[in-house]
């Protein structure tokens, strides 16, 4: 009698779980969220080795807003943190004489406003207002710097010497992580 009772309970549970599975097959989960590509701002915020550039961007609300826009398609060239550590002259400490960046041999004395202007020029030198970028073409950044994109074998380079470490696609463009900065040409070594 006990065997029969256990067998009936097993059949009942098996049948109800089968019916439940069949009925739930056509149902959508209640909390199903639409998957979307992140925007450039989100990519920049979540990329671990690009904190310095990310902090520089945060100083300029117009560019933060640009990186959040859906309808903009831009390419941002992001030097990784190691690239900043290798800079001989930090972007905010560049001295300008007659509008031209020069490498000073003396200690540079610049005002806070000059430093902020230098950072803005630096950020603008790393933004191209088009995306996607095609190989073996030349582009202008927001500040007017010419950037030549080259693909050698499977590697991508900017101006023949700056290696693109990785490319990340966003819904509003692309983020390219670089191993060096696009420093001011007149002070490169």
UniProtKB/Swiss-Prot annotation:
Keywords: Cytoplasm, Membrane, Nucleus, Signal, Sporulation. It comes from the Eukaryota. GO terms for biological process: sporulation resulting in formation of a cellular spore. Pfam families: Fasciclin (PF02469). Disulfide bonds: none annotated. The keyword Amino-acid biosynthesis does not apply. It is found in: Cytoplasm; Nucleus; Membrane. Residues 1-24 form the signal peptide. It is a peripheral membrane protein. Coiled coil: none annotated. GO terms for cellular component: cell surface; cytosol; membrane; nucleus. Its main location: cytoplasm. Residues 37-182 form the FAS1 domain. PANTHER family: FAS1 DOMAIN-CONTAINING PROTEIN YDR262W (PTHR28156:SF1). Has a role in sporulation. This is FAS1 domain-containing protein mug57. It comes from Schizosaccharomyces pombe (strain 972 / ATCC 24843) (Fission yeast). The gene is mug57.
């Amino acid at each position: 009698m006990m065997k029969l009772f256990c067998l009936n309970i097993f059949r009942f549970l098996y049948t109800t779980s089968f019916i439940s599975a069949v009925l739930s097959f056509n149902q959508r989960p209640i909390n199903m969220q639409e998957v979307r590509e992140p925007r450039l701002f989100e990519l920049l915020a979540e990329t671990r080795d690009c904190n310095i550039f990310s902090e520089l961007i945060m100083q300029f609300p117009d560019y933060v807003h640009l990186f959040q826009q859906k309808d903009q398609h831009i390419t941002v060239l992001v030097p990784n943190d190691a690239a900043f550590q290798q800079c001989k002259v930090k972007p905010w400490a560049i001295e300008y004489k007659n509008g031209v960046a020069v490498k000073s041999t003396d200690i540079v004395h610049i005002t806070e406003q000059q430093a902020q202007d230098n950072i803005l020029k630096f950020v603008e030198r790393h933004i191209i207002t088009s995306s996607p970028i095609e190989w073996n073409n030349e582009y202008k950044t927001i500040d007017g710097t010419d950037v030549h994109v080259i693909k050698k074998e499977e590697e991508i380079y900017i101006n023949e010497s700056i290696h693109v470490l990785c490319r990340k696609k966003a819904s509003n463009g692309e983020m390219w992580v670089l191993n060096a900065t696009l420093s001011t040409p007149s002070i490169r070594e």
